[in-house]
Amino acid sequence: VYVLRAFEDADVPGPTDPLEHLRIVELELTLADLETVEAQIERKRKQSKLDKSLAEEVKALDAVHEALADGTPVYRSGVKAADRETIKPYFLLTNKPVLAVVNVDEDQLERVDEVVAPVEKELGELAPVFGACVQLEAEAALLDPEERTEMLDAFGLGEGALPRFVRAAYNALGLRTFFTTGEKESRAWTFRAGAKAPECAGVIHTDFQRGFIRAEVIHWDEL
């Protein structure tokens, strides 16, 4: 999650342009990833001479190293999806899904779309972006539910940033939710987007997946 500053505060040093902040964050993460790859790549090249199964991993590291050395985060690069998958065990910071939160102040809430727009344009389809006044959200979180709702409504914040953040993070990670319900409880379950009914059943219990017969589709209001 990139938390990008847009709020004005003379007591807090640093840029207040979220686009500039984005570039600083990306540069720092890219340099950290470059250091990680350079610490591994020569060792893997030597090992691949004795173990041919490492050839694909070395190829992937070379592709990623080229992008990082050029100052390009992996998620912005043209590195193939297969190569990005191969290097996952290295836990590179710029090879992860990205969610950008532009931290605005109270005075910017009425024009938050305008403040967020340059970051949305820069990231395009690469990452979801939304604005939030983190200071207000933190203050609201300390209140009881009724007072919190009143405060958020007073500032026109609706449900607040947290539910939007959770939904955006779920989508960025390729996660979805299904529900089970019965007389004793209703429960939410997390599954990977694109999973089929048997795989979702397996999330509840592996026996359900092994013994899966069929799924019936009915309208929600018939439940």
List the model feature ranges, each with a label.
Residues E8, P13, L31, E35-E38, ...:
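Hydrophobic alpha-helical hairpins/lids featuring a short glycine-rich hinge
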Residues D17, V25-L29, D33, K49, ...:
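Short, well-structured alpha-helical patches and their helix-loop capping segments
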Residues A39, R43-L223:
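C-terminal-of-GTPase-core extension/linker across diverse P-loop GTPases
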